[in-house]
């Protein structure tokens, strides 16, 4: 038995116009439908309708985590900064980490993740292999001081996450936990009606060497990914790696200096030589994290990938300023590997290793070389994976052309290994009585982000189209003349019947025009609408509308409860 909500009492202030700063459909519709309100940049209040959906997502997450053998707990939001110093992350995390002193001068952080906290929690308790594996999770507000919060709930400064942490004695046990979490996340996405793709991902500041993200496909998603239709490979652009096919540059293989007046761009040089941009080499002048000069070279039609570059040059690397270019003897638009000034490290993309005929800058204004050959004409200090993989590049598994898409990261699973346990002294005794570091895994589900992902994938020109499993209410009962006794009597009969069936019902009992009610209910997106109109009541029927398909049918008053209950229960996951 459920209890109905009446819109005359519901706090859901809808908006007629789109908010000016809302870029994504999910941001725009959640604001317009009276579900969230912005308090400050990246900070939102969840109003009653959104909070009901959030709770449903949380319960789906709990159900799947519990089924996978994980145990729920709760850890504090405030974390002693000393734990972050133990792990070595306090400075590496950067300005996104919210840090502050309490009244006693002790430093704390607001947890964006809780690896340090959970490691400290178990390090004096999990001391034997007999106690392992253990998987602990919590659902909590997290904090990250984003430089540019945007996209509503997609990239906020405060957000709701489910984080789980596994502790194992062996790599095989870690893999088992990892596989269970991947399956749990696939189940969560399916039950929330989120169309998501598991993709190979970079582990970032959390660490570890193996990670999979679940990306909700969305044209307006903030993340880029590539995938193969033939073999199923998928990866985000931070982790996607393949051998880019490159074209040899113009010329006969002899190092030749060519005058190229004013041609300081890849496009201009390629046009001048009558060659595709892929046949040129793009040289980028950088300052690495240690403040040392570097030139990175990639195929002319590809871009330097920021995440990959951080792995090679260190977090905080940057492009050279004009002053630094001059100080290092470099000329913007004409930089190349031949005759590179002394003291500059040369790093080239792995895809260029076999290429023997480069078109590149000559390190002299208005000149380029053709026929430049590695080792013969210049020495490469390091070959590395530097480029962003794009549509058309070969799949690293089967060689077929990759496709590109955009997505929203809703969850991620990591194999952390011993990064935190070694740094923080979390050890156990194995079967042979030897002390070893705990082997850790972690995984996170963005609960508030999942809410936005559902809306991003389920909407139309009229508003949100909630799937039943996460809808704030499953059925809207809309009496068009709530002041008439006949209408009120039938309305109460239907509402009582639906509530008795355990259906979640909202009743639009407001004294408003029918058009206003229809527009508001379509905007809020309840899966089914039962409309009580004057003409239908005379005929002993009500109108049943499926919000997702727009289909309408007249149903006898004494049959509508059974029909709606059947539809809703079949659609629940």
Model segments located where?
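NTP/phosphate- and nucleic-acid-binding module
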Residues: 1-573
């Amino acid at each position: 038995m459920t209890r109905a909500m009446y819109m005359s009492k519901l706090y859901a202030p809808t908006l007629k116009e789109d908010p000016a700063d809302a870029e994504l459909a999910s941001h725009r519709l959640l604001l317009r439908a009276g579900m969230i309100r912005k308090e400050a940049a990246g900070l939102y209040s969840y109003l009653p309708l959104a909070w009901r959906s959030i709770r449903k997502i949380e319960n789906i997450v709990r159900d799947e985590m519990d089924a996978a053998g994980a145990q729920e707990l709760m850890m504090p939001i405030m974390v002693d900064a000393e734990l972050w110093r133990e792990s070595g992350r306090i400075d590496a995390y950067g300005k996104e980490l919210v840090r502050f002193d309490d009244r006693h001068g002790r430093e704390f952080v607001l947890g964006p993740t809780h690896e340090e906290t959970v490691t400290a929690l178990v390090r004096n308790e999990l001391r034997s292999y007999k106690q392992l594996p253990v998987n602990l999770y919590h659902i909590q507000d997290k904090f990250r001081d984003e430089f540019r919060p945007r996209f509503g709930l997609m990239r906020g400064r405060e957000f709701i996450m489910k984080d789980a942490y596994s502790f194992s004695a062996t790599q095989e046990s870690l893999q088992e936990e990892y596989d269970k979490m991947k399956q749990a996340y696939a189940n969560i996405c399916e039950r929330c009606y989120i169309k998501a793709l598991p993709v190979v991902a970079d582990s970032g500041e959390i660490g570890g060497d193996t990670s999979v993200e679940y990306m909700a496909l969305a044209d307006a998603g903030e993340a880029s990914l590539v995938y193969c239709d033939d073999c199923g490979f998928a990866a985000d652009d931070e982790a996607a790696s393949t051998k880019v096919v490159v074209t040899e540059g113009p010329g006969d293989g002899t190092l030749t200096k060519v005058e190229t007046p004013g041609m300081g761009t890849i496009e201009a040089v390629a046009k001048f030589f009558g060659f595709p941009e892929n046949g040129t080499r793009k040289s980028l002048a950088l300052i690495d994290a240690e403040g040392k000069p570097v030139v990175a070279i990639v195929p002319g039609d590809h871009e330097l990938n920021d995440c990959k570059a951080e792995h090679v040059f260190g977090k905080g690397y940057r492009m050279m300023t004009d002053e630094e270019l001059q100080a290092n003897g470099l000329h913007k638009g004409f930089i190349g590997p031949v005759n590179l000034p002394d003291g500059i490290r040369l790093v080239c993309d792995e895809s260029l290793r076999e290429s023997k005929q480069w078109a590149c800058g000559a390190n002299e204004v208005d000149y380029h070389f053709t026929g430049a050959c590695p080792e013969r004409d210049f020495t490469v200090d390091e070959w590395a994976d530097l480029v962003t993989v794009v549509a058309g590049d070969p799949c690293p598994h089967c060689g077929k052309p990759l496709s590109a898409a955009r997505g929203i990261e809703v969850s991620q699973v990591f194999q952390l290994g011993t990064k935190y346990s070694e740094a923080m002294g979390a050890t156990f005794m194995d079967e042979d009585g030897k002390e070893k570091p705990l082997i850790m895994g972690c995984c996170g589900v963005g609960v508030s982000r999942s809410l936005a992902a559902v809306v991003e994938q389920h909407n139309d020109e009229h508003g949100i189209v909630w799937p039943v499993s996460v809808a704030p209410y499953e059925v809207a009962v809309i009496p068009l003349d709530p002041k008439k006794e006949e209408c009120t009597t039938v309305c109460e009969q239907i509402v009582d019947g639906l509530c008795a069936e355990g259906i979640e019902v909202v009743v639009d009992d407001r004294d408003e025009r029918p058009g206003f009610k229809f527009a508001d209910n379509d905007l809020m997106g309840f899966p089914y609408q039962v409309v009580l109109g004057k003409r239908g009541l005379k005929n002993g029927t009500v109108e049943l509308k499926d919000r997702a398909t727009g289909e309408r049918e007249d149903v006898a008053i004494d049959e509508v409860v059974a029909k709606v209950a059947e539809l809703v229960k079949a659609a629940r996951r």
